[in-house]
Swiss-Prot record:
CDD domains for this protein: EF4_II (cd03699), EF4_III (cd16260), LepA (cd01890), lepA_C (cd03709)
UniProt family annotation: Belongs to the TRAFAC class translation factor GTPase superfamily. Classic translation factor GTPase family. LepA subfamily.
Its job: Promotes mitochondrial protein synthesis. May act as a fidelity factor of the translation reaction, by catalyzing a one-codon backward translocation of tRNAs on improperly translocated ribosomes. Binds to mitochondrial ribosomes in a GTP-dependent manner.
EC number: 3.6.5.-
Catalytic activity, as annotated: GTP + H2O = GDP + phosphate + H(+)
Membrane disposition: Peripheral membrane protein
Transit peptide: 1-37
Domain tr-type G: residue ranges: 65-245
Residues annotated as binding GTP: 74-81, 138-142, 192-195
Localization per Swiss-Prot or TrEMBL: Mitochondrion inner membrane
GO MF assignments: GTP binding; GTPase activity; mitochondrial ribosome binding
Protein name stated in the entry: Translation factor GUF1, mitochondrial
Keywords: GTP-binding, Hydrolase, Membrane, Mitochondrion, Mitochondrion inner membrane, Nucleotide-binding, Protein biosynthesis, Transit peptide
Length: 663
């Protein structure tokens, strides 16, 4: 301890001494030693004053006219992330073969071959002697992440419209094309996977021409996997995609494209600078939350975070604050940021909207002791995904848990995978359900996300004017030979046909209005089964409609099992009721008394199964001729069972719920 105090005194004396006076020990502190004890803010300022690197000098020398911001529009699994890797290799951003799916950071993205979070990467490309700054934004392809897709498109000036040569145009290609078209992006047709034996580039080009009315003469045919013709894409990007419009002399205007959480830096924002410039030390304000932040660092993704002294109009990069933004809920996708004092000089960028949860599940730990771990795991994942809604709830059967809201079924499935892979959570998940709107006689409206809140008693039903459920406009693409089966599936799920179009001799685009509740009930799995995996699906919200929905309950010896209840359409009740009681019977152990399993809506029983009790042979020691004694013992056994059934609790193991709730 005495030695430590002496060292501290020596350091303190050294820092206070004049530089001319020699130090009392051999080690001489550098002139800027006081920075070792400086605050984070001064450290950020010091970072900003560092001399620019060779990379930064090249970037600063490039005018906005030689910027190109682009993304890749594609259906799931058409090779978007692989093509991104090839472009990064060709521009020298990464070493050839050094990584795969560089822009897919999550384990679940690499395993499923999908993109969940929007990512970006900056590339430098020399074309005809001039340096060009290319910003590639890798966007999710699935409908559940449409908010991230549309915000990413808003930060771009053009897009590569990527189509698989063997599969052709698919549902999400169509949906994402219209999103890109609505943003006014310049589209470059690209046919991928031309090296496959099943590839038919000519058919894919015809589909693009007839479906999107694009000039396919300039289309580029590539194989992202082998690198075939990918080098032709870079000159095409430079020549066909326009430069971003912006002025670095105007007041700062920044679009928030995405965000992620860092343990040390807090929330890091992915931004597109539309006007002005931003650097460390600037104070920014959010139009959505009105909160103010001091910039700690700005930089580009090259492909990892690479600090820069400034981000100028037209650039896509990252920013984090000091002190850091601690809550990801403050980072709202589509929000506009500007410098403090410029709020009245800048109009917020259009298109900002809060993401709405449309699919809800309940999550419970398999063991009650794991609840704190589950809560901590969910909170950590929420740091990177602000679109999930969380509410604590309790079930008599399963204990404490959470009601979670997601953008869609894939979003829910990805979240569940991340809970298990990244945090080792062992959980029970209820089947997905959708919100229900209640219009009361008083004129009020209530959106119900949990079956517990559904007004199913007679007194409550009297106060209800009507129930409504959400509908979606569904776009399905598939080979024409499956048309009859697909129409039958849609009609069987309460669908209403909107349009039918043959966009090639063999492919059909079918549009249906469907209840969202039917869509989340494994509709896509049934569609894939009917079409042997050749169908694709996309959907968009289509408002609320009046509906005859009821709360279906599961009763065990007349006691409701709250964790299993669901709000369903009246037409599904007979099928689901019978399915429930039959399946639940398989997983409940026999008891010493009779167990009655029932499915009910209100006071009406719609299905029933019975589990017989264990039978004790009370007549084993009796003589065959003792009839009165026989009757007496059987009557006493019968009364005992009734009494046991009245006071006994049915023991239902967690594994029974796990098996029942699994598909």
């Amino acid at each position: 301890m005495r030695g430590c105090l002496q060292s501290v005194r020596l350091l303190t004396t050294a820092l206070g001494q004049s530089p001319r006076r020699p130090l009392p020990f051999a080690f001489r502190l550098p002139p800027n030693a006081s920075r070792l004890f400086s605050t984070c803010a001064s450290r950020a300022a010091a970072t900003a004053k560092k001399p620019p690197s060779e990379l930064e000098e090249r970037i600063l020398a490039i005018p906005i006219e030689r910027y190109r911001n682009f993304c890749i529009v594609a259906h799931v699994d058409h090779g978007k992330s692989t093509l991104s890797d090839r472009l990064l290799e060709l521009t020298g951003t990464i070493e050839p073969g050094s990584n795969k799916q560089v822009l897919d950071k999550l384990d679940v993205e690499r395993e499923r071959g999908i993109t969940v979070k929007a990512q970006t990467c900056t590339m430098l490309y020399n074309h005809k002697g001039d340096d060009y700054l290319l910003h590639l934004v890798d966007t999710p392809g699935h409908v559940d992440f449409r908010a991230e897709v549309s915000r990413s498109y808003a930060s771009c000036g053009g897009a590569l419209l990527l189509v698989d040569a063997s599969q052709g145009v698919q549902a999400q290609t169509v949906a994402n094309f219209y999103l890109a078209f609505a943003q006014g992006l310049e589209l470059v047709p690209v046919i991928n996977k031309v090296d496959l034996p099943s590839a038919d580039p000519k058919r894919a080009l015809e589909q693009m021409e007839t479906t999107f009315e694009l000039d396919t003469d300039k289309a580029v045919l590539v194989s992202a996997k082998t690198g075939l013709n990918v080098q032709q894409l870079l000159p095409t990007i430079v020549e066909q995609i326009p430069a971003p419009i912006g002025d670095h002399t105007k007041p700062l205007r920044v679009l928030l494209v995405d965000s992620w959480y860092d343990t040390y830096k807090g929330v890091i924002l992915l931004i597109r600078v539309f006007d002005g410039s931003v650097k460390a030390g600037d104070q920014l304000v959010s139009f959505a939350t009105q909160k103010k932040y001091i910039v700690g660092e700005v930089g580009i993704m090259y492909p990892n975070q690479t600090a820069q002294s400034v981000l100028r109009a037209g650039q896509v990069g990252y920013v984090y604050f000091n002190p850091g933004m601690k809550k990801s809920q403050e980072a709202k996708i589509g929000d506009t940021l500007t410098k403090v004092g410029s709020e009245k000089l800048v109009k917020p960028l259009p298109g900002f909207e809060e993401p709405k949860a449309m699919v809800f599940v309940a999550a419970y730990p398999v063991h009650a002791d794991d609840f704190p771990h589950l809560e901590d795991s969910i909170n950590q994942l929420l740091l990177n995904d602000r679109s999930i809604t969380v509410k604590k709830e309790s079930s008599e059967a399963l204990g404490a848990g959470f009601r979670l809201g997601f953008l869609g079924t894939l979003h829910c499935s990805v979240f569940q995978d991340r809970l298990q892979q990244e945090h080792g959570a062992n959980i029970i998940i209820t089947p997905p359900s959708v919100p229900c709107k209640v219009l009361w006689n008083s004129g009020e409206e209530t959106v119900i996300t949990s079956p517990v809140d559904f007004p199913d008693g007679d007194s409550n039903r009297m106060k209800v004017k009507e129930f409504q459920e959400p509908y979606v406009l569904t776009t399905l693409t598939f080979p024409h030979e499956y048309l009859g089966k697909v129409i039958e599936l849609c009609e069987g799920n309460r669908g209403e046909q909107v349009s039918l179009e043959f966009f090639t001799a063999s492919q059909v685009i079918l549009k249906y209005q469907l209840p969202l509740a039917q869509l989340v009930d494994d509709f896509f799995g049934k569609l894939k089964g009917l079409t042997k995996g050749y169908a694709s699906l996309d959907y968009e919200e289509s408002g609320w409609r009046k509906s005859n929905v009821v709360k279906l309950k599961l009763l065990v010896n007349k006691m409701p099992v709250d964790a299993v209840s669901r709000v369903v359409h009246i037409s599904q009740v007979p099928r689901l009721g019978k399915q429930w009681v039959t399946k639940f019977k398989e997983h409940v152990d026999r008891q010493m008394f009779e167990i009655v399993i029932q499915a009910a809506i209100g006071n009406k029983i719609v299905a029933r199964e019975t589990i017989k009790p264990y039978r004790k042979d009370v007549l084993a020691k009796l003589h065959a001729s003792d009839v009165t004694r026989r009757k007496k013992l059987l009557e006493r056994q019968k009364e005992g069972r009734k009494k046991l059934q009245a006071v006994g609790n049915v023991v239902i193991e967690h594994k029974a719920f796990q098996a029942f709730l699994s598909k």
